[in-house]
From Swiss-Prot:
Chain residues that bind a divalent metal cation 2: 225, 294, 327, 421
Cofactor note: Binds 2 divalent metal cations per subunit. Has a high-affinity and a low affinity metal-binding site. The true nature of the physiological cofactor is under debate. The enzyme is active with cobalt, zinc, manganese or divalent iron ions. Most likely, methionine aminopeptidases function as mononuclear Fe(2+)-metalloproteases under physiological conditions, and the catalytically relevant metal-binding site has been assigned to the histidine-containing high-affinity site.
Record GO biological process: proteolysis
Compositionally biased residues, Basic residues: 56-70
Function statement: Cotranslationally removes the N-terminal methionine from nascent proteins. The N-terminal methionine is often cleaved when the second residue in the primary sequence is small and uncharged (Met-Ala-, Cys, Gly, Pro, Ser, Thr, or Val).
Name of this chain's protein: Methionine aminopeptidase 2-2
Cellular component per GO, a single term: cytoplasm
Start and end residues of each stretch annotated as Disordered: 1-102
Cofactor needs: Co(2+); Zn(2+); Mn(2+); Fe(2+)
Chain residues that bind a divalent metal cation 1: 214, 225, 421
GO MF annotations, alphabetized: initiator methionyl aminopeptidase activity; metal ion binding; metalloaminopeptidase activity
Cell location: Cytoplasm
Family: Belongs to the peptidase M24A family. Methionine aminopeptidase eukaryotic type 2 subfamily.
Amino acid sequence: MAAQVPTEALKELNVGGPATNDKAANPTEGNGVDHDSDDSDEEGEEVAAPAAGGAAKKKKKNKKKKKKKSPTAQSDPPRVLMSSLFPNKNYPKGQEEEYRDENLYRTTNEEKRHLDNLNNDFLTDYREAAEIHRQVRQWAQKNIKPGQTLTEIAEGIEDGVRALTGHPGIEEGDAYKGGMGFPCGLSLNHCAAHYTPNAGNKMVLSQGDVMKVDFGVHVNGRIVDSAFTMAFEPQYDNLLAAVKDATNAGVKEAGIDVRVGDVGGVIQEVMESYEVEIDGTTYPVKSIRNLNGHTIERWSIHGTKSVPIVKSNDTTKMEEGDVFAVETFGSTGNGFVREDMEVSHYAKRGEGHAALRLDSAKRLLNVINKNFGTLPFCRRYLDRLGQDKYLLGLNNLVSSGIVEAYPPLCDKKGSYTAQFEHTILLRPTVKEVISRGDDY
């Protein structure tokens, strides 16, 4: 989920200038696991001692009930609980990369290994969330087709995530334990981020659309944030390739003690080495300079650190223990986004809140606290919980500074934008690209 850079911050960081010369094993897919521990049935007959009349009586067969086998493959659509596919919670690792230069020692350092071993719950939750993201998105990539409504697509992805986490999110507090880390974004063409359909939306995916699919999965508040772009016409291939390569370059550059401004420089250099021809016109691919990657904190999608996607003078260092969403956006337009269209994404702020006078706002805040906490949500999620006539209260929460609204972020109309994103864990011993898969 994209983090937007305030306009005044761009000036302070001196970003957006020309790029300079400053300069993987995939996880197991997890769609099948061996379960050969089922006992074989023992059937038999015992002959009783002869009765008084001399005839032997047979006892009834004592059949043992067959143990129900654990599922070994994901269903289509995905509905098999992830913990059923991995009953020992031995979820696939992400792509592990050794640190470079002065941090290379971390790979074999005993103290760092000990610290890594203390993170068992942290890693288990993250790897489960990542495997759920992989399985749901791979299903989505095979099944999303032009002609579907955006609501169908979003609900298909969200239903899959909820089923695999085992948290449908209907009972009070259930969505807070696991499920969607933030709403499924389906931003089309010039719209780069933060668009998901509200109730009643009839928008249909078309053959000529470029769609960013950005969704999060959380397990116990540990959020995997990963995104990809889909297009159905080959003329957009270079746009998608530029952004995918730029994201991979940013992921490769990231690491402990690396300055985020340098990561942005690497991303921009790769991104802007591409151009794309659309309908006979050639466009340079531009990094969208006021969108950022970001740290992820428990229960909070946007942490305190940002990762620019253009070179900047931001000297903030990445540190051991940080979780980063490295995401990049490329555009054939201005390379700058503005708020546009109807708001769908919201999140409660973590800091202290003002007193509320409106009863509807108080009631809605209680629902948000119990079901989402500081996790982002959308209007459709309130609809699922049976809330109605809540817009007045929701707008009051926004105007009071208690809830933040995230409007769609769009470049100029007629342009096309693309996005790819991975979540990385800066573990004490290695960098783990937790969301890496065979697809991207």
